[in-house]
């Protein structure tokens, strides 16, 4: 692991993710056959830019980026009084050189208007009280709204088309108070009037299974939430009880609340160990924006900053440190001096501790040294991660020396992520298929997008292609300058670019909740890396898409890296196993989500039916374009043929091509025949295509029946051999059933050739493509579905004017977003660090008009309400005057409390937002899709989920009538044997019918009313009586792939 004190090299030694040297392979197709080209031999993508243009526009990235202090002079008015009294001294190491990483603030000396460097800062130390004491011009927590709100509102509405004018207005507003709201580096902390909690009270809270009011108040004050998520309070109270813990929570679930709230409750300090400087920067900035005192200390921190932390430790709530820094002599001495204030040591991204994880870092192993010190050994320790198998968890616990740790886990399943896999062909064509265009953003993927690539060269190529076709993108890898990396990171965080193309090292360093797309252009390193990297998408709970474009040659590059990584043999073997598991996800014809999740939790139950908005395979099955019952294939006979040929003809070690040629009767291999049994095997598989045999071999390798070995003379390739599992199976002669791939299902003839292998039975390889999944509707109606216009609770509630309401809500949301962007630019932070997208959605839907009504806004901390609340409220008031839209909408006036409670229990966050918007505003699916920036098919799928739980919809707005429901019921009973699993034959059976999306709702209503027949002996429907689906022109598709939660037009139908 690289120390924070060191200059960052272009690679991380010993890591699987390190960049290949120029002599190693990147893009060659046949690694085993030929030595790959070097980077210098490859064609490069050129750009018609001058050298200066390239320097100005190109970006770079690295996971351990440290904000530099590039000084860009700009004229702003500065008061003499502040300049004289608020000067921060800098040590001798400070300079204008951007590579020095100096964190001190520059204050001008005397003139009223001077050249003032704008410092790009990684926030370190702040206070309000000390500045008030130093400066004659005191300031409060926010801009004086009495003085500037009216003027700012008018200017904000009129001047967003002119960014330079906007910047000057906001700078002038700040200098009215003489101090920016975000204080600069090198300053002290604010005093919070929080009473010290005695030990008895702390232990009382630790014993409470339900959170006390004090905890709920702190949660609302700092995080804006009115209640804890499941298991969050359990983790918090165990911290209060002084217990060690291992916490495994999926990305976006709220791990930070678990380790941040205890210090805020107890008025104590938490030391957070985090692997990446960029991640620490983002998290500290977010905490400060909420009025929480936090500091980051790393190898670039000055001695002044260390001294200021030591002198103000009673005020600091959080210290973020890298593992190298916290275990250094200087770091341990600081912990010792702060010991009486420290209540918790939090190890974030704890999977880095384990050598069996995908991102092992040796520096994390040294954290156990803290437990060796008598003065620090009693600090409670909590290890947190979103990615860990049982083996990794046990390794982390052992290496950190956690004492009888309490283990808390949540589901790995992130339902708002849609998984899709594609073959990579032409770069521009592959990526262009999923783009949209608008006047403001140009071409984009529907929201902030991260594209991961395996090599720096591929990053540069993808970025060049994107720019050429009009995408605002930047590249981010270790090969360029620190300034370029910093600019790319900052511009992406602040939405100045829509897409960032990066090497996989960038993944853990992103802390942006509204990433809508994660695209892998090239195969990920392994299944755990893939899960970690797609975890960057949709952390705000909104629908997001995860795509992989890959080719088999990508696997060769990864295997080459593994073989040459000089890691322990057992570690390489484990990483290779995880690569095989990923390959299964990429090639399966079944649910990709299921294949992904069962790696982390073998007990994860396979869903009984296809899941809406789950993955591309489920979408294909819902459309009727694929048979879900054929996710397992029987390849007993063919496997025996292949294994016998490998052992008898090639002495158990060979490339896969020669045994296949032998089985298919190639004249190249007939010279090997020496016995009668060998003659019988020669050409026995000639009726089966070559690509089918290769797919079978790949599947047997993934399943562990075939192994890979590298002979001494083989530099790049490897050969296959029967594994111990394969040898045992060959002796037993049992059935061989493996996970199907599209080629295994489609590429083989239905009738297998008669077997000539003793003891082998006729193959039942692929199931008939006419079989369809079964989901049998119950025979009798068990309850009646009530739409919204028949629901008594909804009919008796307060009505609101709905004419044009969805459009008005969307317009208001746009104005609110513009104000947020303006404030973010003023403070030089990302827009989501001002308030989240969810908060803006609440403002647009509930429309509060006073400070007291801000309590209805969930997710907005007390500090955010104080600083920014009036800006958004004023915008709502002005918009209401212009449009007449209703304000101060109480959710209980529109939706009964009982219904709200049910929604919260049975619907995910993303589904609940879509359902609530439809229910309150009586919107059509198209209106909801436009407002939320997702596809119309996604809206229908989400609403169908609500219907299956019995929640009411405005069916008249969705073009669903009782007549259509009756027609659909009759068709499924008469023609399909009550099988509602697949929509395509159902549509054909009905004739003139609603479209697929409306049929989704009808099916959900029928399932709610009749239930499903769960008997094991249910008869399958007669395939012969079903309408033919052989004509592709009659097969429709369901555009159910989610796109984005940004305000953009809904996606067109996807080609899957």
Swiss-Prot record:
Main subcellular location: nucleus
Catalysed conversion reaction: Couples ATP hydrolysis with the unwinding of duplex DNA by translocating in the 3'-5' direction; ATP + H2O = ADP + phosphate + H(+)
Q: Which Gene3D superfamilies match?
A: HRDC domain, P-loop containing nucleotide triphosphate hydrolases, Winged helix-like DNA-binding domain superfamily/Winged helix DNA-binding domain
Q: Specify where the region named 2 X 10 AA repeats of N-[ED]-E-L-P-E-T-E-P-E lies, as residue ranges.
A: 17-37
Enumerate the sequence repeat regions by residue range.
17-26, 28-37
Cofactor field? Zn(2+)
Other remarks?
A: Unlike orthologs in vertebrates, this protein does not have an exonuclease domain.
Protein name, per record: ATP-dependent helicase wrn-1
Organism this protein belongs to: Caenorhabditis elegans
What gene does the UniProt entry assign to this protein? Answer: wrn-1
């Amino acid at each position: 692991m690289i120390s924070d004190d060191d200059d960052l090299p272009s690679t991380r030694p010993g890591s699987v993710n390190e960049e290949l040297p120029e002599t190693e392979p990147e893009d060659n197709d046949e690694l085993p056959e030929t030595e790959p080209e070097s980077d210098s031999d490859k064609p490069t993508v050129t750009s018609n830019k001058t050298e200066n243009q390239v320097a100005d526009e190109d970006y770079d990235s690295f996971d351990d980026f440290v904000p530099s202090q590039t000084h860009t002079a700009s004229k702003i008015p500065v008061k003499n009084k502040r300049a004289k009294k608020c000067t921060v001294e800098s040590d001798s190491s400070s300079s204008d050189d951007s590579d020095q990483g100096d964190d001190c603030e520059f204050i001008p000396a005397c003139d009223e208007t001077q050249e003032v460097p704008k410092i790009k800062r990684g926030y370190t130390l702040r206070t309000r009280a000390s500045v008030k004491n130093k400066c004659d011009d005191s300031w409060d927590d926010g801009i004086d709204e009495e003085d500037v709100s009216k003027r700012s509102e008018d200017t904000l509405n009129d001047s967003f088309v002119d960014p330079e004018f906007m910047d000057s207005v906001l700078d002038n507003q700040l200098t009215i108070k003489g101090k920016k709201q975000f204080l600069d580096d090198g300053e002290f902390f604010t005093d919070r009037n929080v009473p010290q909690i005695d030990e008895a009270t702390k232990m009382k809270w630790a014993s409470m299974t339900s959170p006390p009011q004090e905890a709920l108040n702190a949660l609302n004050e700092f995080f804006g939430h009115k209640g804890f998520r499941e298991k969050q309070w359990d983790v918090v109270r165990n911290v209060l009880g002084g217990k060690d813990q291992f916490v495994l929570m999926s990305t976006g679930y709220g791990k930070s609340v678990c380790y941040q709230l205890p210090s805020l409750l107890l008025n104590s300090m938490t030391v957070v160990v985090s692997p990446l400087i960029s991640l620490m920067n983002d998290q500290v900035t977010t905490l400060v924006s909420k009025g929480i005192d936090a500091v980051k200390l790393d190898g670039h921190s000055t001695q002044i900053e260390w001294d200021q932390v030591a002198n103000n430790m009673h005020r600091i709530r959080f210290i973020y440190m890298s593992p190298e820094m916290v275990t250094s002599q200087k770091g341990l001495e600081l912990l010792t001096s702060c010991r009486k204030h420290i209540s918790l040591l939090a190890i974030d991204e704890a999977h880095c501790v384990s050598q069996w994880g995908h991102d092992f870092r040796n520096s994390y192993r040294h954290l156990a040294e803290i437990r060796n010190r008598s003065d620090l050994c009693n600090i409670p320790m909590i290890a947190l991660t979103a990615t860990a198998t049982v083996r990794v968890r046990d390794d982390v616990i052992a290496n950190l020396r956690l004492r009888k740790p309490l283990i808390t886990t949540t589901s790995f399943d992130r339902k708002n992520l849609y998984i899709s896999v594609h073959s990579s062909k032409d770069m521009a064509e592959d990526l262009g298929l999923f783009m949209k265009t608008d006047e403001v953003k140009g071409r984009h993927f529907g929201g902030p997008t991260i594209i991961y690539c395996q090599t720096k060269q591929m990053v540069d190529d993808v970025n060049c292609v994107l720019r050429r076709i009009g995408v605002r993108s930047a590249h981010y890898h270790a090969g360029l300058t620190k300034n370029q990396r910093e600019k790319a990171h900052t511009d992406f965080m602040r939405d100045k670019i829509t897409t960032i193309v990066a090497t996989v090292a960038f993944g853990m360093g992103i802390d942006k909740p509204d990433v809508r797309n994660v695209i892998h252009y090239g195969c990920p390193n392994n299944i755990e890396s893939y899960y970690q990297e797609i975890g960057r998408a949709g952390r705000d709970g909104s629908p997001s898409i995860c795509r992989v474009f890959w080719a088999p040659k990508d696997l060769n590059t990864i295997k080459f890296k593994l073989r040459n990584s000089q890691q322990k043999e057992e570690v390489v073997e484990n990483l290779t196993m995880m690569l095989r598991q990923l390959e299964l996800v990429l090639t399966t014809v079944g649910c990709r989500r299921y294949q992904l999740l069962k790696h982390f939790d073998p007990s994860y139950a396979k869903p009984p039916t296809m899941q809406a908005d789950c993955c591309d395979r489920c979408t294909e099955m819902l459309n009727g374009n694929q048979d879900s019952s054929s996710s397992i294939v029987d390849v007993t006979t063919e496997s025996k043929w292949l294994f016998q040929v490998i052992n008898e003809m090639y002495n158990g070690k060979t490339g896969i091509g020669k045994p296949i040629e032998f089985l298919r009767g190639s004249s190249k291999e007939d010279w090997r025949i020496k016995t009668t049994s060998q003659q019988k095997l020669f050409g026995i598989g000639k009726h089966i295509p070559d690509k089918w045999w290769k797919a079978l071999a790949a599947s047997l390798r993934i399943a562990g029946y075939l192994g890979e070995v590298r002979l001494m003379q083989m530099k790049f390739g490897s050969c296959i051999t029967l594994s111990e599992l394969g040898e045992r199976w060959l002796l037993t002669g049992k059935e061989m059933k493996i996970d199907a791939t599209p080629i295994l299902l489609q590429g083989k003839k239905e009738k297998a050739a008669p077997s000539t292998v003793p003891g082998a039975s006729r193959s039942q390889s692929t199931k008939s493509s006419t079989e369809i999944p079964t989901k049998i509707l119950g025979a009798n109606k068990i309850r009646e579905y009530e739409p919204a216009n028949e629901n008594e609770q909804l009919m008796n509630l307060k009505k609101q004017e709905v004419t044009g309401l969805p459009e008005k809500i969307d317009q208001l949301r746009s104005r609110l977003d513009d104000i947020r962007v303006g404030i973010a630019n003023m403070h030089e932070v990302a827009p989501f660090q001002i308030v989240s997208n969810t908060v803006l959605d609440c403002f647009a839907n509930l429309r509060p008009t006073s400070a007291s009504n801000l309590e209805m806004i969930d997710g907005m901390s007390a500090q955010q309400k104080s600083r920014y609340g009036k800006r958004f409220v004023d915008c709502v008031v002005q918009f209401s005057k212009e449009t007449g839209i209703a304000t101060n909408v109480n959710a209980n006036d529109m939706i009964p409390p009982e219904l709200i409670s049910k929604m919260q229990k049975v619907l995910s966050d993303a589904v609940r937002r879509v359902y609530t918007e439809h229910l309150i505003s009586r919107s059509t699916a198209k209106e909801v899709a436009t407002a939320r920036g997702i596809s119309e098919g996604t809206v229908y799928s989400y609403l169908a989920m609500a219907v299956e739980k019995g929640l009411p919809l405005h069916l008249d707005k969705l073009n669903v009538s009782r007549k259509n429901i009756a027609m659909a019921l009759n068709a499924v009973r008469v023609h399909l044997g009550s099988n509602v699993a697949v929509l395509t034959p159902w549509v054909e059976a009905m004739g003139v019918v609603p479209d697929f999306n409306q049929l989704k709702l009808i099916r959900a209503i029928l399932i709610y009313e009749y239930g499903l027949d769960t008997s094991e002996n249910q008869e399958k429907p007669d395939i012969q009586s079903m309408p033919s689906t052989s004509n592709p022109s009659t097969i429709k598709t369901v555009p159910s792939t989610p796109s984005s939660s940004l305000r953009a037009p809904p996606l067109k139908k996807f080609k899957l």
